[in-house]
Amino acid sequence: DYLTTDTHNPLEQNYYEKGIEEINQKSDLIIFTDDVEWCKNNSFFKKKNIYFAHEFTKSIDILDLCLMTKCKNHIIANSVFSWWGAYLSHQEKVIAPKYWFKNTKNSNLKTEDLIPNSWIQIEN
């Protein structure tokens, strides 16, 4: 859905790589996505400690959200769904994109109230 919107930019692989570095853990990663095929065809997601949530939840949204709330750390997309998954969890770290909307760098869109102070924002 973000591929065709005028409001949000899809996040690049580089954002997720920076997020993993920021979390700095060797633990397993669970990927929540609505584009599993793209992820499976991308070499970045072929590491042995990566799992896809749909393998556990059958892509049922409420089950995805419940599983998200059980995760210790989060690297979220600029989406309401991943935001709520992180917000409702008892997370140690949440990595969020610095720029949530297209053209945030040069516009009047304010996102100060969108990201809690304890979350870490990184360039995207």
Task: Give the ranges of each region predicted by the language model.
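Short, glycine/charged-enriched secondary-structure capping and boundary segments
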Residues: F44-K47, S89-Q91, L109-T111
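Residues at the C-termini of beta-strands that transition into short coil/loop
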Residues: H54-F56, K98, S118, E123
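Leloir-type glycosyltransferase catalytic cores
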Residues: T104-N124
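Low-complexity, compositionally biased segments
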Residues: T4, E37-W38, L67, P116, ...
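A donor-sugar binding/catalytic signature common to diverse glycosyltransferases
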Residues: D61-S107
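Core catalytic architecture of nucleotide-activated donor-dependent transferases building glycoconjugates
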Residues: D1-S59
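Intrinsically disordered regions, especially transient/low-confidence alpha-helical propensity segments
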Residues: E12, D35, V80-F81, P97, ...
